Swiss-Prot record:
This is Protein FERTILITY RESTORER RF2, mitochondrial. PANTHER family: PROTEIN FERTILITY RESTORER RF2, MITOCHONDRIAL (PTHR34938:SF1). It comes from Oryza sativa subsp. japonica (Rice). Keywords: Mitochondrion, Transit peptide. The keyword Iron does not apply.
């Protein structure tokens, strides 16, 4: 569907308007096909005529899309969260490792990392206590040596 529109200004402006359908919606576009003048017209008048044609547009109505929600369980039964059954292993959810694993008795290689960390912390604690005892012995030995020197 196309229409021709003419405008009576000092010159004639012919626009070509067409309606297009896209996805169930209609859009109307207009293009200036030719501009002809019989005499000289100022640029201001030409811009006004183009501006007049540009502001005369039609609003297009768009159909809104609707979505239907289908239940995953047609019987209406919903499943609750999986609970821990009390057996050994990690909690049901661990960050970065995915879900589920609470009742399975743990996962071998992941347990080794925790054991290694605990062993390192235990070793550092032992070294800290050992250093405190060593410093205390040196202070006592130095204190006794100083007392012996003063008494002689």
């Amino acid at each position: 569907m196309s229409t021709l529109v003419t405008c009576s200004l000092p010159g004639a402006v012919t626009t070509h308007a067409s309606t297009r359908r896209f996805g169930g919606s209609q859009f109307q576009t207009s293009q200036a096909s030719c501009i002809s003048f019989k005499r000289e017209v100022s640029a201001k008048a030409v811009l006004r005529s183009v501006r007049c044609n540009a502001t005369q547009t039609q609003s297009a109505q768009r159909k809104s899309s609707t979505a239907t929600v289908k239940r995953s369980d047609p019987k209406g039964k919903t499943q609750g969260p999986k609970l821990d059954d009390g057996s050994g292993g990690f909690p049901p959810f661990r960050f970065g490792k995915g879900g589920g694993g609470g009742g399975g008795g743990g996962g071998g290689s992941n347990y080794f990392g925790g054991f290694l960390l605990f062993t390192c912390v235990l070793l550092l604690d032992y070294l800290k206590e050992f250093e405190k005892n060593l410093i205390a012995r040196r202070q006592r030995a130095g204190y006794d040596a100083n007392n012996d020197m003063f008494q002689q």
